[in-house]
């Protein structure tokens, strides 16, 4: 079997259903999406474990870790967007049966991950100065810096892991990153605990130890997935590490052109939700607490459309690579229908259990009754937001599959900052709706964003068919 035959063999659907049937598209999308969802949930599990173990150091440590994550994730989000461009580039090459381009796209992704990680480390390593400049208490900023000093060095391997995960998903093999992430969860918990408290003769490192543990786990997961890519079939058939020293500058420019708008869109979204916390803080402490818990529920729910959106990138990219416009349209449609159906079902479950979710975090005491009530109200108001946010995530993924990210950035600016934030401000402070007004505003803005993405995909899909 030749290298081209290998690619074409692995590109075939794993079911026996003909490829041009909608049922097959549903199966293939789910087969890709489920491991991606679980991998993302695994990442959340590690972050949650870190915070739980840091919580044993006291409230000051938890507050410092929250500040540190704010600084870290602003920087990391930029790299995340660039690495998200690896998947569509590989998917298109895979659809076209171009082994060499698969290898080149991954190689460029790894080089870009390394090169951008160096300037990206500046923000975490100078996090204390940034936090003080933003008005944070110097003691909290100093504590946050300890955590960041350990965390910053894990940026490069974390980005490398994302690039390799994107390549594996794009060649229809998303399982290895999931296995590695699941294995890393207990390892991460043990390592964080040992380094925080200084067991087995090691020094007690506190917050620095928690950050260092995350860096070591990032390095370990990257090396594990790199080893699988290099030596395990079908990945080894693509010779992913061949000529690794060569930098393909035209492809670097293409990756940056595709990924930079993704990074900017993610930063606009991150900025919106950061501003939401500020708005809630202006309303009341109860509003801020209820908002944070509602967002935690949203974050878990978000993994479903995120996984489907990643799968949409791959499925649309495959069709685009093999020059099959009808399949491009079908892949986007199926992903949207599947995502909206699943998110709608989960949204109904959240609405029915909204009070129980509030009590899970705040307990059932009279003192927390008002916070539980507001949390339940926000989750009810958020029903439209959940569905719209899921749809925009999926359609954004589908558009990446056909290399359309610049208009997505423009739509994000319109939906988030021209609609969501102004409407949230007016409803919260000029109509007396308070926290509920913020969520209504965000729901309206996200709905506008999702609608624009749907129209954009339909227009481009029709243009491809035409």
From Swiss-Prot:
One of its GO terms (cellular component) is membrane. It holds the Pfam family MatE. It is a multi-pass membrane protein. The keyword Ligase does not apply. The keyword Ribonucleoprotein does not apply. One of its GO terms (molecular function) is transmembrane transporter activity. InterPro entries: MATE_fam (IPR002528), MATE_MdtK (IPR050222), MdtK-like (IPR048279). One of its GO terms (biological process) is monoatomic ion transport. Its main location: membrane. Keywords: Antiport, Cell inner membrane, Cell membrane, Ion transport, Membrane, Transmembrane, Transmembrane helix, Transport. It is found in: Cell inner membrane. The chain crosses the membrane at residues 68-90, 110-132, 142-164, 177-199, 209-231, 251-273, 288-310, 331-353, 368-387, 407-429, 433-455. Belongs to the multi antimicrobial extrusion (MATE) (TC 2.A.66.1) family. Multidrug efflux pump. NCBIfam families: matE. This is Probable multidrug resistance protein NorM. The gene is norM.
